Amino acid sequence: MCIRDRLNTFAQTLQNFFLNPRSYFDPELWQAVLTNNLARGLKIYDHDVHLSAWADVVNAANDAYEPGNFTTFIGYEFTTSTDVANENLHRNVMFKSSNAPKRPYTRIDSINPEDLWNWMDKIREQGIDSIAFPHNSNGSNGQMFEMETFFGEPLSKEYAALRMRNEPIVEMTQVKGTSDTHPLLSPNDEWADFEIMEARIGSIPPAFSFPAGGYVRDAYIRGLMSNQFGTGNPYKFGLIGASDTHVLGAGLREDNYWSKIGLVDADPRARGSIPVSEEDRNIVPNRGGVSFKEFEQGDYVIGGLENWGASGLACLLYTSPSPR
């Protein structure tokens, strides 16, 4: 079965799981909601459905893998946030091989990213290696790269080592804006306002996302400061860029264009082929100008991390060296 068919099956499973687990008038459901009792709420849902849906994701990735031709990774999104509304702390978690845990670690288990890293350490000891990479730190309201732990404790060398062991890379640009820098953080950089999304994701009305602690240049400075203070550098990470479209489709051809979950690519206006309406201008399109980066020739190092990222259409061109 192709990836798209498997994902359709997975999406239908999730729809049935979340929308119709029980009647909305079920007293046990309302007791869980009104008392904010997570343990009671979890008893309501069918965990077998949850596990089978995750198994479909794992099998879809492994079935589509063609060594040397098409590389797939098993992965999911850890969609956590702080207790403050819309402070995004999302991470993508990607597994190194075809081995995956029976179920992923989610915000249902904990909203603390440090608990995610400890879980990753634990399954790594069992032979299941993975990395997590934060994305949309620009919408974290300054919480992604804090100078303290999730619960406000001082940073430490142990914290820095734990974070860097599990989060050696950050997604600095994607469809919901760049997380490189911000005009308030880099006032002398004329490019600092490139594809900035000021609001926290999903906030209605839009709530301003505080820049300091949410952008990678600022994080690099904070990491150096932490190291200078003797508490290690928790922000010595590489960079990538992505689309965050959630559709597994690359924007390779205009006549087969995929973008953010079908909501911003359904017609020429939404794709930006014609002027965009005022209400859609806060959506950063998954496209852009062409730029080139020249790589030094040499062997590809497995596990190497780049220091740049790009969203939208990107390609790698290789030219053989001219004979001397």
Give, region by region, the residue ranges found by the protein language model:
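Extended, charged catalytic domains and RNA/DNA-binding interfaces, predominantly
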Residues: 4-320, 324
